Amino acid sequence: MSEVHVHRVQPAWKKNALIDNDTYLKWYADSIKNPDKFWGKHGKRIDWFKPFSKVKNTSFDGKVSIKWFEDGLTNVSYNCIDRHLKKRGDQTAIIWEGDNPYDDKKITYNELYERVCRLANVMKKHGVKKGDRVTIYMPMIPEAAYAMLACTRIGAIHSIVFGGFSPDALAGRIVDCESTFVITADEGLRGGKSIPLKENTDKAIDIAAKNFVMVKNVLVVRRTGGKVGWAPGRDLWYHDEVATVKAECKPEKMKAEDPLFILYTSGSTGKPKGVLHTTAGYLVYASMTHQYVFDYHDGDIYWCTADVGWVTGHSYIVYGPLANGATTLMFEGVPNYPSQSRFWEVIDKHKVNIFYTAPTALRALMGAGNDPVKKTSRKSLRVLGSVGEPINPEAWEWYFNVVGNGKVPIVDTWWQTETGGILITPLPGATDLKAGSATRPFFGVKPQLVDGEGKVLEGAADGNLCITDSWPGQMRTVYGDHDRFVQTYFSTYKGKYFTGDGCRRDADGYYWITGRVDDVINVSGHRMGTAEVESALVSHDKVSEAAVVGYPHDIKGQGIYSYVTLMKGEEPTEDLRKELIAHVRKEIGAIASPDKIQFAPGLPKTRSGKIMRRILRKIAEDDFSTLGDTSTLADPAVVDDLIANRQNKKG
């Protein structure tokens, strides 16, 4: 491996940092030695209606049970809004920056309180109760945050579906959690293009009805004023409804382990999993990681560029920052609209201090050269962050030297939908940085590397990343399917949470995430199960079989490479290729569009019928010199055809 460039903690980073290296080492040791005492103390960072007396009650064995602060009573929206009103009611809670650079607004904590209470009362008026599931399918507008917080105020469980997902994907998520109330907008706006959210919702509701889940009401925010279909009695205009209710709504007293939200994520088997997070442990962990990972100080302007449809938006646009009384920026647009300078212009316009984005955006912007960055000052920046996938050292150095002018620490954070918050990360005033490494575990997090047989690897090693004990932000179950939860995360290596990621630990104890080791690919920082894309392809009537693998992609990190076998008598044509791409977009959404489709007469299978994905990956990477033993294949000649017709030939 090439020489790793270490960036030592600069004196300026250390000067006002919340944590230095000695403090990190002490706190970390305490958190591992005595988790009850450590989290008992930090559990008090949120306000409780009834304090907890039990801290940790968790087991990774057998049935797997995870409970934190279980006898306490609290409320998330109270912690994100009410408790701040006395001290910072007139402070900006949310800065909203629209798709169009001239479109922005600021919402204070007082205004946030009123809007969330009104929306909570609208839901109550229409029969939404504690424990009911509410589906949110929204653009990046403040009402998306109001909807989340209003659910938490009345104890409803929200399930947010990313606005880029198709009607079919939305319907599947409505059906799985039997949601009867949906909040959406007429249209979304992204990069100057409108997205037909209400139209998609109408289609999804029809599909859900065929699966015996009847949506009673759809609350529609007017974003663009575009024309939409309307079902009187079912559909409600947001602006009409909030005008008819009171601006006060008492927060429900929620048990620490009451469900907070469900967020669907791709798995290595076809059906998306409803990751379930609960109330108190999640909020303690999201707010604590937000404070210490980003070295958040009172008054900082904080911007995470994610969408609330992903877990990063849940934890680090809404819940973490607002629980800490921060000013959080919500961005509706994309990095390159109307120009390649957009991110940096927004940073200057709103004097952003902490900026958190994804490697895929950075690689695309890096490709546009340094000029769009250099046009802006960015002098307000104090901390930079990266999330969603491992960041390659070249992109890291560009981020550090060009965006941060070599003066701003980068926190390269590793975590997952399932973990609720950041697990492995540098801390700005404490951790020497290495380009491409997530560095060290956060407090209370016990990483372990194991080999394929489950043998624990000590010291510098390369293996599968597991976590050996619970932390408060951990998911509790797969919604409606606890067996799947145990099977997916705790059966590969007994008594350990298996992350599904490969990882290398270097001689300094730093962790380097090497990517998924299961059948999940990471496209632009978003997880996509290969099985999901395969089932979408196979549902086309001309396709007999499909296999999907990831391959290295300059911008997205990983691209989607599909091998497709057609039904007898069907001809592989360019038109069919386009038709299949459109079909996948309809089934799942644009995010799952195959980058390459290779028509193949057959797939490499063992005699027992198992597809040899290892071989398909190598061919997709144009690296077939090390295909290994193909003698176990039922028909070794298939491989020659795949190599001859590969789509990624170099040179």
UniProtKB/Swiss-Prot annotation:
Q: Name one GO cellular component term.
A: cytosol
Q: Which UniProt keywords apply?
A: Acetylation, ATP-binding, Ligase, Magnesium, Metal-binding, Nucleotide-binding
Residues annotated as binding Mg(2+) are V538, H540, V543
Query: SUPFAM superfamilies given for it?
Result: Acetyl-CoA synthetase-like
The record's annotation in InterPro entries points to: Ac_CoA_lig, ACAS_N, AMP-bd_C, AMP-bd_C_sf, AMP-binding_CS, AMP-dep_synth/lig_dom, ANL_N_sf
Q: Which cofactor does it need?
A: Mg(2+)
- In Gene Ontology terms, what is a biological process of this protein? acetyl-CoA biosynthetic process from acetate
PTM remark: Acetylated. Deacetylation by the SIR2-homolog deacetylase activates the enzyme.
The family classification in the record reads:
Belongs to the ATP-dependent AMP-binding enzyme family.
Name of the protein in its database record: Acetyl-coenzyme A synthetase
Q: Which species does this protein come from? A: Mesorhizobium japonicum (strain LMG 29417 / CECT 9101 / MAFF 303099)
Q: Which gene encodes it?
A: acsA
